[in-house]
């Protein structure tokens, strides 16, 4: 609850203003039992007193009703502005946090779960806030006014009102833990379902290609049935909880009616007061019933607060504050006895990796899958820190450098190109403002995209489908290459960037890269060994270690691992 209130810090005064207008808005309902009792007692008294009581109480009621609409408008305006702005602010805070969290954090949690937290859980928090502000405020206000008036009129009947509180508390205690447990199970199951649905959608081409539609339907059906079962358990617990509270409170109301009727029969209270006390007790019972019915919503909302808090409170963030900011980068790298193992694994994927790289050199890294090539690239970008050893950049340890300033000098082309829905121009100039047409043309030409752009209906402004689905694999890869090249980086990282290109495009890209890597430090991870003939230095990795290193010709002359890899590829061409 403290976390939830923290979300609204700075807006408490607006809530108080809204609460004030809420009180005015509901004043006709709050005072109606008293006004009705006044009319009944006046009529029973007869004469001028009856006329006066009818006119006075009716006039007061109509006067209170006349201010309902303006009070409702002001109450809703203040409440909605606070809740909606906080809802948007909470999602923005989660987006900012996700951008700060480390890459290992994102690899360990499914994107569907994060999507569920940002959309579904924040929506549940908004519902909780609305329910608490409207219903809880209404409950507190009604209870306070009814109990206060009853205490002034008759303290004996007040005993019935007061006894409702401990009975409600016992009912809540009896069900609270179970509701909380079932709510948590349902929330986790919904996150899993969200992740499975996203995974299913992304896998549709693979599923269709292997005629596995029925298998996937069955898999999703089991998941959805499990979610439905968890939801059923939650519904039953909530239903039983509400029914138990209702029965107990109705018993109390029947006793209150009998007791107030007995007191009127004995002449201790007026007949009209029976209506007042019964209406007041009905209001009190209804408020406690509403409070009990509100508990499942509050439990669900507070579980969502916990879920969102898991992200916002995570300390698995990339720390850059106070570290050295790079104003320039020459591109000299030194890897000193580098070692790394992934969390939860006993095996090192990199061990005793040593290499010195001069500015402007092109370094190629080759090896079988699992040799540690991609891990090395992730360490080089700063996605992870080495378990032991050092990476020196222009003589400075990477752990002491502000990585945001370092990455401004990098361009990375991943093995799988990542494109978003938008124009081709937007995808290439992602994150850059005011890119000239000349610079864009140069990047398109260098990445062998000029011919493609000329054929598109709107040229560079042609919209791409989701993930660039309306392009070939090679075209998507070339867009990723153009995105890297347009930044005019000091360091280029190519993670098997030409693996999706046809032979003709590969040759053209190779010529472009030879021009563009000049005076830039370049790291290339490659499977096609023919693409790294002109590399200044080739590192052959095996089981996380450097097995051999040298120029293309030197390695072939040694007839070692590299020679056998190249011979095998030559035989397959």
What residue ranges belong to the model's regions?
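A short amphipathic helical element positioned immediately N-terminal to and/or at the very start
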Residues: 1-12, 114
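Conserved catalytic Walker-motif region of ABC-type ATPase nucleotide-binding domains
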Residues: 98, 220, 308, 335-337
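ABC-type nucleotide-binding domain
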Residues: 327-573
């Amino acid at each position: 609850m403290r976390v939830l209130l923290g979300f609204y810090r700075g807006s408490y005064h607006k809530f108080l203003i809204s609460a004030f207008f809420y009180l005015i808005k509901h004043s006709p309902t709050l005072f109606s039992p008293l006004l009705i009792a006044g009319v009944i007692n006046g009529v029973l008294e007869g004469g001028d007193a009856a006329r006066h009581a009818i006119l006075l109480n009716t006039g007061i009621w109509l006067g209170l009703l006349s201010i309902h609409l303006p009070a409702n408008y002001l109450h809703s305006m203040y409440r909605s502005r606070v809740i909606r702005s906080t809802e948007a602010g909470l999602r923005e805070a989660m987006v900012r946090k996700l951008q700060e969290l480390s890459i290992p954090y994102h690899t360990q949690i499914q994107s569907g779960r994060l999507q569920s937290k940002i959309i579904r859980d924040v929506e549940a928090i908004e519902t909780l806030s609305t329910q608490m502000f409207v219903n809880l405020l209404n409950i507190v206000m009604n209870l306070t006014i009814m109990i206060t008036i009853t205490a002034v009129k008759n303290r004996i009947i007040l005993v019935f009102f007061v006894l409702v509180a401990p009975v409600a508390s016992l009912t809540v205690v009896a069900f609270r833990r179970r509701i909380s447990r079932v709510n948590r199970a349902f929330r986790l199951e919904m996150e899993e379902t969200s992740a499975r649905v996203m995974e299913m959608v992304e896998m549709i081409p693979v599923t269709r290609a292997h005629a596995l539609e029925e298998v996937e339907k069955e898999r999703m059906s089991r998941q959805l049935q499990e979610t439905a079962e968890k939801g059923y358990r939650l519904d039953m617990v909530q239903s039983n909880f509400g029914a138990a509270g209702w029965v107990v409170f109705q018993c109390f109301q029947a006793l209150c009616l009998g007791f107030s009727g007995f007191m009127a029969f004995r002449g201790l209270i007026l007949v009209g007061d029976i209506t007042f006390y019964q209406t007041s007790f009905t209001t009190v019972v209804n408020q406690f019933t509403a409070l009990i019915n509100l508990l499942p919503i509050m439990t669900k909302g507070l579980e969502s607060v916990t879920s969102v808090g898991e992200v916002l409170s995570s300390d698995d963030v990339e720390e850059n504050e106070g570290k050295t900011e790079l104003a320039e980068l020459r591109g000299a790298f030194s890897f000193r006895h580098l070692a790394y193992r992934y969390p939860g694994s006993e095996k090192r994927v990199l061990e005793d990796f040593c290499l010195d790289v001069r500015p402007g050199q092109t370094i190629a890294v080759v090896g079988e899958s699992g040799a540690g090539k991609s891990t090395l690239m992730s360490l080089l970008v700063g996605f992870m820190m080495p378990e032991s050893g050092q990476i020196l950049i222009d003589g400075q340890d990477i752990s002491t450098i502000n990585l945001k300033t370092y990455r401004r000098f990098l361009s990375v082309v991943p093995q799988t190109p990542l494109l978003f829905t938008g124009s081709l121009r937007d995808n290439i100039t992602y994150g850059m403002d005011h890119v000239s047409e000349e610079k864009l043309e140069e990047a398109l030409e260098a990445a062998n995209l000029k011919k493609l752009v000329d054929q598109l209906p709107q040229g560079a402004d042609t919209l791409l489908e989701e993930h660039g689905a309306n392009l070939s694999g090679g075209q998507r890869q070339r867009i990723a290459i153009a995105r890297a090249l347009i930044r005019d980086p000091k360091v280029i990282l190519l993670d098997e960037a030409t693996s999706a290109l046809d032979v003709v495009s590969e040759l053209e890209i190779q010529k472009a890269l030879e021009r563009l890597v000049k005076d830039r430090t370049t790291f290339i991870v490659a499977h096609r060994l023919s693409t790294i003939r002109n590399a200044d230095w080739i590192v052959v990795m095996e089981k996380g270690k450097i097995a051999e290193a040298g120029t293309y010709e030197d390695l072939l002359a040694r007839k070692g691992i590299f020679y056998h890899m190249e011979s095998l590829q030559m035989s397959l061409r």
